[in-house]
Curated annotation (Swiss-Prot):
<comment type="similarity">
    <text>Belongs to the PNP/MTAP phosphorylase family. MTAP subfamily.</text>
</comment>
<keyword id="KW-0808">Transferase</keyword>
<dbReference type="InterPro" id="IPR010044">
    <property type="entry name" value="MTAP"/>
</dbReference>
<keyword id="KW-0539">Nucleus</keyword>
<keyword id="KW-0660">Purine salvage</keyword>
<feature type="site" description="Important for substrate specificity">
    <location>
        <position position="224"/>
    </location>
</feature>
<feature type="binding site">
    <location>
        <begin position="85"/>
        <end position="86"/>
    </location>
    <ligand>
        <name>phosphate</name>
    </ligand>
</feature>
<dbReference type="Pfam" id="PF01048">
    <property type="entry name" value="PNP_UDP_1"/>
</dbReference>
<dbReference type="InterPro" id="IPR035994">
    <property type="entry name" value="Nucleoside_phosphorylase_sf"/>
</dbReference>
<feature type="binding site">
    <location>
        <begin position="212"/>
        <end position="214"/>
    </location>
    <ligand>
        <name>substrate</name>
    </ligand>
</feature>
<dbReference type="GO" id="GO:0005634">
    <property type="term" value="C:nucleus"/>
</dbReference>
<keyword id="KW-0963">Cytoplasm</keyword>
<dbReference type="GO" id="GO:0005829">
    <property type="term" value="C:cytosol"/>
</dbReference>
<keyword id="KW-0328">Glycosyltransferase</keyword>
<dbReference type="GO" id="GO:0019509">
    <property type="term" value="P:L-methionine salvage from methylthioadenosine"/>
</dbReference>
<dbReference type="GO" id="GO:0006166">
    <property type="term" value="P:purine ribonucleoside salvage"/>
</dbReference>
<feature type="binding site">
    <location>
        <begin position="52"/>
        <end position="53"/>
    </location>
    <ligand>
        <name>phosphate</name>
    </ligand>
</feature>
């Protein structure tokens, strides 16, 4: 049966969504993940929960050890990953309290370790020129969308986010430029998480929890307090979504999807095909 990794953003680090939760401490070649990983089940499906910012929310977006987080989930054998992320809206119709299921991302980060293939001692062999499109696994994305429809949660099926370095919010000039690009969201944690999952050959999709209108909208000033107030209201929606989505994911045979994802990741590496990459092993056909 499939094993689901869940990366929870702000507010979604509650281990009580799991039955029989067990905390697991893991060290990785890339250092420590953000917190203990919590293993348990949801609707009979094995799950591993990781709080992206730590359970005390004391790790800012640029300091999250994304590589360690993804490697830790891989080492516990997760087959697919679903995530949540708080976002500001760049479109009037994408209102605070809504959910959006991104289909792409524009990367504006500048100081994050964004690949496992970095030539260091701990790094994977070779150089990976991973295809960044499609950014998210479409089959997994559709499960989240259909679950939101089933749960009658107000949501948007498509849209892309601009991922900024943070931890500050956008300037007015930045917000207006991002809006002019046609982006739906501005965010601080979409990258490089989705790309690292692709490098590991793990299907990944995220749910954007809209907390505010970014500062392009003059009448709404973005503050940490206002963001957290709306986010607190979103948390219960996201929990409902994930609990139901995990049940749906558990009904699906993911073997072909995982094979395709791992094969694509292996083919992206500039290295002799005879070199074995342990974490991208696929069954012989």
């Amino acid at each position: 049966m499939v094993k689901v990794g869940i990366i929870g953003g702000s507010g979604l680090e509650d281990p009580n969504i799991l039955l029989n939760p067990t905390a697991i401490s893991i060290d990785t070649p890339y250092g420590q993940p953000s917190d203990h990983l919590i293993q348990g089940t949801i609707n009979g499906v094995e799950c591993v929960l990781l709080a992206r910012h730590g359970r005390k929310h004391d790790i800012m977006p640029g300091n999250v050890n994304y590589r360690a987080n993804l490697w830790a989930l891989y080492s516990l054998g997760v087959d697919v990953i679903i995530a949540s992320t708080a976002c500001g809206s760049l479109k009037e119709e994408v209102a605070p309290g809504h959910l959006l299921f991104p289909d792409s991302v524009f990367d504006r980060t500048n100081s994050r370790k964004a690949t496992f293939f970095d030539g260091t001692f701990s790094g994977a062999p070779g150089v990976s020129h991973i295809q960044a499109h499609p950014t998210y696994n479409e089959k997994l994305r559709q499960v989240l969308i259909s679950t939101a429809e089933k749960c009658k949660l107000v949501h948007h099926r498509t849209g892309f986010g601009v991922c900024i370095e943070g931890p500050r919010f956008s300037t007015k000039a930045e917000s207006m430029v991002f809006k002019s690009w046609g982006a739906s969201l501005v965010n601080m944690t979409m990258m490089p998480e989705c790309i690292l999952a692709k490098e590991l050959g793990i299907p990944y999709a995220t749910t954007a929890l809209v907390t505010d209108y970014d500062c392009w909208k003059d009448e709404d000033q973005v503050t940490a307090a206002s963001v957290m107030k709306v986010f607190a209201a979103n948390v219960e929606k996201a929990k409902t979504l994930f609990i139901e989505a995990v049940a749906e994911i558990g009904k699906i045979d993911w073997s072909a999807e995982i094979l395709q994802t791992k094969t694509a990741a292996r083919q992206s590496i500039m290295i002799s095909p005879d070199v074995e990459v342990e974490f991208l092993k696929v069954p012989k056909t």
